[in-house]
Amino acid sequence: MEVVDPQQLGMFTEGELMSVGMDTFIHRIDSTEVIYQPRRKRAKLIGKYLMGDLLGEGSYGKVKEVLDSETLCRRAVKILKKKKLRRIPNGEANVKKEIQLLRRLRHKNVIQLVDVLYNEEKQKMYMVMEYCVCGMQEMLDSVPEKRFPVCQAHGYFCQLIDGLEYLHSQGIVHKDIKPGNLLLTTGGTLKISDLGVAEALHPFAADDTCRTSQGSPAFQPPEIANGLDTFSGFKVDIWSAGVTLYNITTGLYPFEGDNIYKLFENIGKGSYAIPGDCGPPLSDLLKGMLEYEPAKRFSIRQIRQHSWFRKKHPPAEAPVPIPPSPDTKDRWRSMTVVPYLEDLHGADEDEDLFDIEDDIIYTQDFTVPGQVPEEEASHNGQRRGLPKAVCMNGTEAAQLSTKSRAEGRAPNPARKACSASSKIRRLSACKQQ
């Protein structure tokens, strides 16, 4: 084909351009004929944790799935940006308080904090938690009735009371019990989460009196709706648990309003109706937990002794299953770290194939690490110290990083047969305790 000078094309009309061969290198194709290559998922490591896909996002930050490269346990990490926390009232204080509380709590029905990582340079905090497959609110939203069968609701409620009793025994008032803060594992274990607005009572406090509340409006008791200066913290949790039980068994809320002012007005009056299909035992329990006067409201001991709580409820309806993943529609909620794991395991070791967030990740503290002497050669063979940054567990980050890069360049065919977990650990520049 004859090559045409581009400067001469402006002298031709459209018809003349076609005659000189423009149609031979300008093609129009339908979008259905285009085959897009999927974007390669680059592996990203935060300390010893391999990052997966997004699980959810809230006002405080994002939650992603991660894999512990040492234990191969599935975890969830809450990623918090200090810049964003400053824009939220009491944001930083709530996060630090939640970390302090979770560090000393150990119960099967309370979410466990596994690790805390802090990135000084990017001003990011990573709260590594045990993995929960789904939230209770997500399960309720997945069915038209917006409720659980009585047998399933009873099982979840009993676990909620177990976890709540443990928190109260530790002198902690949750203040925000609701389905949105109750998570579930694949085995059906309920976990109380989000202790950001919780309050730890003084060890020598005479009672459970509280003065502040930041919980969700629909789950607040009349004493808070009416603006009382002080109130019983434990009875606030009992009320919120009662509203939660009402919601998961009926699909409704005892109090509603077009806006928060109308909602608080209705809560302050204390008038509500219980659907007739709840039955006398459940209705009596709800009335005891939603008692207007805090002094007359049920205690956890009274809830445990109630006939509806103690009764064994046979399954009359099919239980609400864990819904498919909202993004991938995966009904099994498979591990989202698998594509990243395959990338590390299947590809040659190259620095361009993975990302390490930083050479140094500070753990379990908000301060910069200490310094240790770096050896410097002298005339008599002895070495003197220069400062060298280290990880919180004493690992020399720069030395590990250099060693990792040197190993990656060394030709050794046997290394390709290593397991995925050992490869992740070798790529991680800074081991965590």
UniProtKB/Swiss-Prot annotation:
UniProt-annotated stretches for the region Sufficient for interaction with SIRT1: 45-90
GO BP of this protein: activation of protein kinase activity; anoikis; autophagy; axonogenesis; cellular response to UV-B; dendrite extension; DNA damage response; epithelial cell proliferation involved in prostate gland development
EC class (word): transferase
Bias kind Basic residues: ranges: 423-433
Effect ascribed to mutating G171S: In colorectal cancer; somatic mutation; impairs heterotrimeric complex assembly with STRADA and CAB39
Reported effect, G215D: In colorectal cancer; somatic mutation
Effect of substituting K48R: Enhanced phosphorylation at Thr-336 and Ser-428, enhanced cytoplasmic localization and increased kinase activity
Catalytic residues as annotated in Swiss-Prot or TrEMBL: D176 (proton acceptor)
Impact noted for substituting R87K: In a metastatic melanoma sample; somatic mutation
Subcellular compartments: Nucleus; Cytoplasm; Membrane; Mitochondrion
GO molecular function, one term: protein serine kinase activity
Protein name: Serine/threonine-protein kinase STK11
Species of provenance: Homo sapiens
Gene from which the chain derives: STK11
